Amino acid sequence: MDLEGLIRQVKHNCTISDARFWGYYSVCGLLMRMRELYLNEHSLMPWDNAPADAVSRWLSGREAQWGVLEDERLHEIEVGGRLYDPFDADALNLLLRGSKLVYGSGYAMFNKPTFFVGELIESRELLDYRVCFTGHELCRDLSAYAAMLQGRCIYVRHDVIKAIIFDRFQTMRARRYGGVAEEMFRYYGIRKTDVLSHDLIGSFGDMAAAIAEIFVRHEVGEAYEDDGSEEWAEVLLSCNDKHSELYLRGVKDLIADTSNMGPLRAITAAGDRPLLYAYMALLDGLRKELFPMIGNAFQRFVETGEWVAIEGARERGYEKAKGWRESVLRLWNDGGIHAVKKYLVETFSQRPRSSA
C-alpha cells in the first residue's frame, strides 16, 4: 500500500477544507491555528522555536494555495485503484491495519470537514467503543480537537492535548497567582518555576496520557446522550451564524460532560482529585458561562473535600442542559431555525467570550 500517496491525498483534502473555511475564524483564532499547523507540518512541538521569517514565508504560500483551492470539492481517496469516501474512516482504517497509523475524519465547528492521519500508539476497548490514541500526526487541518467520535471509534490525539497543556502552563507562568491551573500541574509534578527541559517535556507527555481520560469520557457521554441527535444535527446544519452555533455546541458539550456516562461522573465515582483539578483548569469561556454552578461546587470541595458538592452540581448542570436541548428541539419543530435563534438570544444574553 502506498502510504505516502494516501497521506498526500488526505493532506490535500485538509488544505481544501482550510481554504473553504478559514474565513469563519476570528483573526486571533486563525493565527493561533495557523501557527499550530505550521508546527505540525514541520514536525515541531508547541515549545519548539519557529523562525519568524520561515513562518511568514509559509503563511504567504499557504494563503496563495487557499486562493487556488477555495472552490475545489473534497477528493475521494484512491487506494489500489479503488476510490473511498474521505469520511469513510472505517474502510480506510481497515486498509491501514498493520501500518501503525490511524485515519480520522468528521465535521468540526461551522460544519468544517476535518481530517488527520496519526501514529497509533495505543488502542483499547471501552464499553461499546474502540478508543484509539494517536501520537505524532502526519497531516491534519486547521481544526484539531483533543478527541473526536466517529462511528464506534473514539480518537484521542495526544499531540493536541500536549499543546493544550503547554498553553495552560504558559498562561499560568504569566500570572502572579496560578490558581487552579497551578494546583493541577502540582498534582503531576510540574511547578510554576520549572524551566523547559527534557524532564519537563516528559512530564507534559505523562500528564497528557493521564488527562486524556477526561476527553475520552466526554466522547462517551456524547455518544450515550443521543436523544434527538438527528434533529440536533439538522439544527446545526441550518444554523448560519457563529453565535448560535457556539451555544448549540456548548449545550451539547455540557450534556456530555454531566451525563452519567461523562467525565464528571467518572471523576467523582473514582474520587480522582488530580482529574477534577484538570477538568476545572480546562473549563473556560462559554463552558464556564453555561455551567456556573460547578465553580461554587468546586470551591466547596476545596474547602471540605466532600465530593457531594461536585455530584450535586453535575446533576443540576445536566438537568439544565437537557432543558435547553428540549426547548431547542421543540422550537425547531414548531418554528424552524428562526425560532431557535430567537430563543438562544433571549436565553443566553451574553455573547460568547471564546475566539473560534
Language model region names:
Residues 1-128, 199, 353-356:
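N-terminal low-structure segments adjacent to metalloprotease catalytic domains
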Residues 51-54, 60, 261-354:
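Long, well-structured alpha-helical subdomains associated
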Residues 141-208:
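Active-site scaffold of zinc-dependent metalloenzymes
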Residues 202-214, 242-253:
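Short, charged/polar micro-motifs that form catalytic or ligand-binding hotspots
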Residues 223-252:
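Post-HEXXH active-site segment of zinc metalloproteases
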